[in-house]
Amino acid sequence: MQEQYRPEEIESKVQLHWDEKRTFEVTEDESKEKYYCLSMLPYPSGRLHMGHVRNYTIGDVIARYQRMLGKNVLQPIGWDAFGLPAEGAAVKNNTAPAPWTYDNIAYMKNQLKMLGFGYDWSRELATCTPEYYRWEQKFFTELYKKGLVYKKTSAVNWCPNDQTVLANEQVIDGCCWRCDTKVERKEIPQWFIKITAYADELLNDLDKLDHWPDTVKTMQRNWIGRSEGVEITFNVKDYDNTLTVYTTRPDTFMGCTYLAVAAGHPLAQKAAENNPELAAFIDECRNTKVAEAEMATMEKKGVDTGFKAVHPLTGEEIPVWAANFVLMEYGTGAVMAVPGHDQRDYEFASKYGLNIKPVILAADGSEPDLSQQALTEKGVLFNSGEFNGLDHEAAFNAIADKLTEMGVGERKVNYRLRDWGVSRQRYWGAPIPMVTLEDGTVMPTPDDQLPVILPEDVVMDGITSPIKADPEWAKTTVNGMPALRETDTFDTFMESSWYYARYTCPEYKEGMLDSKAANYWLPVDIYIGGIEHAIMHLLYFRFFHKLMRDAGMVNSDEPAKQLLCQGMVLADAFYYVGENGERNWVSPVDAIVERDEKGRIVKAKDAAGHELVYTGMSKMSKSKNNGIDPQVMVERYGADTVRLFMMFASPADMTLEWQESGVEGANRFLKRVWKLVYEHTAKGDVAALNVDALTEDQKALRRDVHKTIAKVTDDIGRRQTFNTAIAAIMELMNKLAKAPTDGEQDRALMQEALLAVVRMLNPFTPHICFTLWQELKGEGDIDNAPWPVADEKAMVEDSTLVVVQVNGKVRAKITVPVDATEEQVRERAGQEHLVAKYLDGVTVRKVIYVPGKLLNLVVG
């Protein structure tokens, strides 16, 4: 064994061994308990970033630990390879998206191997290959036949920069989630999957997910947005149709003083025929931003349509307005307005001088003051005829029942969730497998024409999709009739909604899934990824699992038992102000900093002498140029050091602050482990450990070893507090470094301790542990070694610490055998100088003894 720890020499050697031995390849084995550990698959952007490294290190630690427990562990990896960035990069680099993507995959695959992740590479998949997306296309045609897929023209969120449609979930604060451009409204024909048909199940089954973070479950609950209310029908004078509205507050119905409809509503369109002001307003609304955050804060505007609706209970005529806060695609495109008890309705009514009628009393029983704002709290009704005096619940039911009796109301459950629009007007995605025949009939692509292959050898102009620009591509024949293929492609969330299941049978050619393999491995035991996916990917992922279950492919209700959302990785961010006042962000690697005595940055400059402004720690990002390249760190310190720092610096679900001093600390620790093993093995062979022959000091050290095993096992397994597990191993290492190594049993005990330390560190730092295990002559490869088990007998304390008090004040702490009697403890306490001093010449009136903990002598 060489004296110095040289990761650059050992890591590549160990990685080659894993490759040649195919160490992490697994197959179904009914005789073993399975464990499926999955990290969210990466987009092949070109290079790994520290967020990836953190995500995949957490996964690898868990997978290696579970493997050492003797389980059959599946840890696969693949590539979420379709998507818009490839199109932009292709235009920029004068290439096509396919070669750019495949080059990136090859490069990033090497980076993953360099970090020592124990993946089953035989299951690697890329979602952009026809071998993968053919099954997604086939499944889509099956869903169409079941009535779960439909096409309709709808107002969509349109990103003018990316030239594509965004799902509601992809609009963040009125902007595109990807490029931050302001989103516009556009009418476009789109394909939808009926996720709303599964709304109740998606909501109710959240209760089964005991090991998912509450934050994620709450976000999904709110997104699904189930509400109970009443659908009410209004007659409209001089209009052929009725208007239907939905309300969750029928108790306020007697205070309804106007109705509001969307600009796109047929009633508004009809009224606009003779109303130029309304026609102009409708045009303006076409470009209104639709994100809910914007809807809440934008100025509320409207125009009176001139139509009057008749209140079904009072018979009063109330005006119908067109308003920019009502959307056609939400509910019925019409809402009832109760300005006395809804703030939005109040603001609108105040602005346009509409009637405000209070019908709910204030909490103290007085009439509410509506001079400044609406009273939105629930309460007792007044001003409501026969319903006066009823509380919220009684009024809800009484008014709902009355409307139902009259045939103008119906109790309804509503959802905020909308069907999933899966059409994208981009090229680099899986073609949607639908065709339109000459006679206008729309039908699924026949099975014998699947997969509909996306041509990869294309020229990108950055504006039009190559398959839309090439009229020949769309031409096909179905049942002898000419037909045109759909030129939209799937939202890339389609591919990432079922990849986890395809990993169980990546080579299967008879269908989407081999049920036998899928049901052996599924559900996923732990799924690791960022919380930013809470309502997009993680909702679609659950939905797809239920679709596959109902197609008979899987037999579980949910795709993953546990979800672990890792925290972000932060780094220092610096900039200097340029000549034109712009911020030039400087990488923390290039910042020369001065710190105060507490280690805080007080001054910084770059190599060119620019005075830098330090903005604190923020998420590693391209925009702030504060990303740290994992490859550079691995080349400098080794993969094991980077992995150890990642797991030690912070709990897995909290933000991690990148500090190179911390990385250096992790590296020093591994050097200490190496040195201790080197010094130990240099002394030659070791005798067998004779537990019965150990001295008290040796027993105490062995107790520490086994207590550490117990703690680390609990920290990694049950608590998943990996940082505290590492801290416990470090603490033990400090004790081992000071332990005597001269006697035969000293060395035998050291051998037992080091074999345990190396196995406990193995999930975190597998390369160094693989090597040290061999040097310590551990049995076989460490990859097949069992996790160390704490010896309960070794952990039993021989002695215990008893606090001795005189009149309630601590006078001594004594060590006594655990089985010492009260008499023996009193005798031992009396030998302490301070205790003897306070007992001299006084009478002990009372003795309070808590066995093994406390002796209190009351004197007087």
UniProtKB/Swiss-Prot annotation:
Domain of life (superkingdom): Bacteria
Motif ('HIGH' region): 42-52
Alphabetized UniProt keyword annotations: Aminoacyl-tRNA synthetase, ATP-binding, Cytoplasm, Ligase, Nucleotide-binding, Protein biosynthesis
Reaction(s) catalysed by this chain's protein: tRNA(Leu) + L-leucine + ATP = L-leucyl-tRNA(Leu) + AMP + diphosphate
Residue span of motif 'KMSKS' region: 619-623
Chain sites annotated for binding ATP: 622
GO biological process, one term: leucyl-tRNA aminoacylation
Subcellular location(s) per record: Cytoplasm
InterPro entries attached to this UniProt entry: aa-tRNA-synth_I_CS, aa-tRNA-synth_Ia, Leu-tRNA-ligase, Leu_tRNA-synth_edit, M/V/L/I-tRNA-synth_anticd-bd, Methionyl/Leucyl_tRNA_Synth, Rossmann-like_a/b/a_fold, tRNAsynth_Ia_anticodon-bd
Gene3D superfamilies the record matches: 2.20.28.290, 3.10.20.590, HUPs, Isoleucyl-tRNA Synthetase, Domain 1
This protein's GO CC annotations: cytosol
The keyword ATP-binding is assigned to this record: yes
Main location: cytoplasm
Similarity-based family: Belongs to the class-I aminoacyl-tRNA synthetase family.
Protein name according to UniProt: Leucine--tRNA ligase
Source species: Escherichia coli O1:K1 / APEC
Lineage, broadest ranks: Bacteria, Pseudomonadati, Pseudomonadota, Gammaproteobacteria, Enterobacterales
